[in-house]
Amino acid sequence: MQKLMDYFFKRKLKVPRPISNDISVRVKNLYAVYDEKQENQLVALNNISYDFKKNKIYFIIGNSGSGKSTLVTHFNGLMISRYGFVQVGDIVSGDHFDFERQLLGVIDSYDKKIINLLWRNQLDQWTFLVLFSNEVNIQQARILFEANFKQKPISLKFIKTKNNHELITNPYVRENTKIAVVRVDKNVILEINDKMNYEELQRFEFIKKEIKTNYHLSKKIKRFKELRRRVGFVFQFPEYQLFKDTIEKDIMFGPVNLGVKKSEAKKRAKFYLNKLGLGDDYLERSPFGLSGGQKRRVAIAGILAIQNDILVFDEPTAGLDPAGEHEMMQIILDAKANNKTVFVITHTMEHVLEVADEVIVMDEGEIIKTGTPYEIFFDQHIINSTSIQVPRVIAVINELIKKDLKYEILKQKQPRTIEELADAIIEFKKGEK
């Protein structure tokens, strides 16, 4: 009986995976796949791994459709991936489905010995032969092919290598692998380097690495409310977060739902509404009669009232006038000053330069570069390969440098606003005299 009591009442919570105290959000081998079981599946996130540090302002930028919103919606469990995971403290959202080294290589289908084997198996019409671990199924093989080669397969099926002694002579490799025959669109030119010829295929050494999975445990997060308490999400459209008959009730909803007493939630509603520039008289008003900017403030007050450690803003300045944009940037800076970690998705590069501690650039579901605003905006390859437009400050510095290399010194000063740039130029001119 005592053992039974110990089991139910004395079990200690274990941290699923150790994580450093300075890490706010850990993303590990994260894939996001839409319509996974369909042939037209979309790999929206492709094997993303990154450790986001605490008490920093991250701006996530990139072309539309690059995976920015998909990434951040995993942070508080709005989306949960079957492949890879997000960790916030001791809470893991997602599945440790280890895709690493499951796509083992591409076989050279133009090798003479391979051609003969293909012909015997009536597979000469297929475009690519890809060697996979036995651990993956067809859907996962399609995901890995698209993720690695940026091309959707039109069709994919497996050759069973177990009984095909000619194709793979090593019995251990034959037992633990399978070959997919993959066809892509005939109009697509897909060049894959480092293909294995027949001899290399026979010399291939396979190290079995099982896929670890806990999806059946983690798809329903037992500590889901705790995750929402830690990570607050401000949507692009505030209407998503306003649905009560009074502003006070809307702001109170999050805290009360997460276990805060009503009396405390009422205090927080008043405090954060005032903090965002709206008086007590707004508390009993309907949120539906507010302007767009006022709705945004109420929605943010509702998130701040939860007192999260992490805040995510999706296009926070969309539809705001310049004064509203300035207020929003100040809210973000205030959040950092209160020891919060902030993530901002935006297409407004002026705000990135003014406020960001670190910039994350995404493209085709991958993080392609990280760095300070100056490291990003002076990377010509990034600017040319994306739709990112440099802020006015950077554009002016570029023009000055074209006219005279002495203005390179402005890059060291790193002004973030037009006013700071003007001050830096005046200071530089004084130094020349």
Swiss-Prot record:
GO terms for cellular component: ATP-binding cassette (ABC) transporter complex. Its EC number is 7.-.-.-. It is an enzyme of class 7 (translocase). It is a peripheral membrane protein. InterPro entries: AAA+_ATPase, ABC_transporter-like_ATP-bd, ABC_transporter-like_CS, ABC_transpr_CbiO/EcfA_su, ECF_ABC_transporter_ATP-bd, P-loop_NTPase. ATP binds at residues 62-69. SUPFAM superfamilies: P-loop containing nucleoside triphosphate hydrolases. Its main location: membrane. It is found in: Cell membrane. It holds the Pfam family ABC_tran. One of its GO terms (molecular function) is ATP hydrolysis activity. Forms a stable energy-coupling factor (ECF) transporter complex composed of 2 membrane-embedded substrate-binding proteins (S component), 2 ATP-binding proteins (A component) and 2 transmembrane proteins (T component). Belongs to the ABC transporter superfamily. Energy-coupling factor EcfA family. ATP-binding (A) component of a common energy-coupling factor (ECF) ABC-transporter complex. Unlike classic ABC transporters this ECF transporter provides the energy necessary to transport a number of different substrates. PANTHER family: ENERGY-COUPLING FACTOR TRANSPORTER ATP-BINDING PROTEIN ECFA2, HEAVY METAL TRANSPORTER. NCBIfam families: PRK13631.1. This is Energy-coupling factor transporter ATP-binding protein EcfA2. It comes from Ureaplasma parvum serovar 3 (strain ATCC 700970). The gene is ecfA2.
